[in-house]
Amino acid sequence: MSLTIFPSLPDKTLAAVNTVGAWLAEDNLPYNPPALLPDLVVLAGNAVIPSIDAACRLASELGIPLLISGGIGHSTTFLYAAIARHPRYNRIRTTGKAEATILAEIARAFWQIPPEHLLVEDQSTNCGENARFSAAA
């Protein structure tokens, strides 16, 4: 399998994208426990660290399972780069690993989500497969 190499973006552009991602993942509403707890949180593989953190935080705080979907696909290298740049997560080895495997390691090591609360789908190679394979999990 070959990975698509995208053109490099300037650091200023990447910083702006990460700022928008952090804002979108922000949860600044007063906490009111939901009347009905969700059955699980679904996290599709991606390289936006704030959205990864938000999904892990929600699963951890509510004590519910986290389904993580993502194999190795066209944007996996972006996740590898984001992890390498992250001040805490950069100790995780990423090369050759599926996105879901990396994100599950983050969930366990940094968010203390127990292994029995993690469902890992690591075969999908794109967003459509993330959804289809997650539904089957």
Predicted regions and their residues:
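A structural signal for short, hydrophobic/glycine-enriched beta-strand patches
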Residues: 2-137
